[in-house]
Amino acid sequence: MVFLLCFFLVADVSYGINGDCELPKVVGFCRARLPRYYYNSSSRRCEKFNYGGCGGNANNFHTLEECEKVCGVRSRDSPKEN
């Protein structure tokens, strides 16, 4: 029983979300429309958006793979287009 409790506590910590991933999506105030990905904490998925090119925050990734790796998204979760 103690083993199971320890296992679930460790598993929960290992899938914790990076603090940057909890930041809201920020398009920025320029008009470049660069394809990027951000972690949507509501859907618990990385989603595509168009980044303006300036401003923004750390929840802004060049690739889906980078977003999933940094934010701990499991591969069974599919991306959602925005």
From Swiss-Prot:
Domain of life: Eukaryota
Database matches in Gene3D superfamilies: Pancreatic trypsin inhibitor Kunitz domain (4.10.410.10)
Cysteine disulfide links: C21-C71, C30-C54, C46-C67
Any GO MF annotation of the entry: potassium channel regulator activity
Location of this chain's protein in the cell: Secreted; Nematocyst
Signal peptide stretch: 1-16
InterPro entries, per the entry: Kunitz_BPTI (IPR002223), Kunitz_BPTI_sf (IPR036880), Prtase_inh_Kunz-CS (IPR020901), TFPI/VKTCI-like (IPR050098)
Keyword Disulfide bond on entry: yes
CDD domains: Kunitz_actitoxin-like (cd22633)
UniProtKB keywords: Disulfide bond, Ion channel impairing toxin, Nematocyst, Potassium channel impairing toxin, Protease inhibitor, Secreted, Serine protease inhibitor, Signal, Toxin, Voltage-gated potassium channel impairing toxin
Residues in BPTI/Kunitz inhibitor domain copies: 21-71
CC annotations in GO: extracellular region; nematocyst
Propeptide: 76-82
Site feature Reactive bond, where: R31, A32
Annotated transmembrane regions: none
Function of the protein: Serine protease inhibitor that inhibits both tissue and plasma kallikreins. Has hemolytic activity. Inhibits voltage-gated potassium channels (Kv).
Recorded family membership: Belongs to the venom Kunitz-type family. Sea anemone type 2 potassium channel toxin subfamily.
Protein name: U-actitoxin-Avd3q
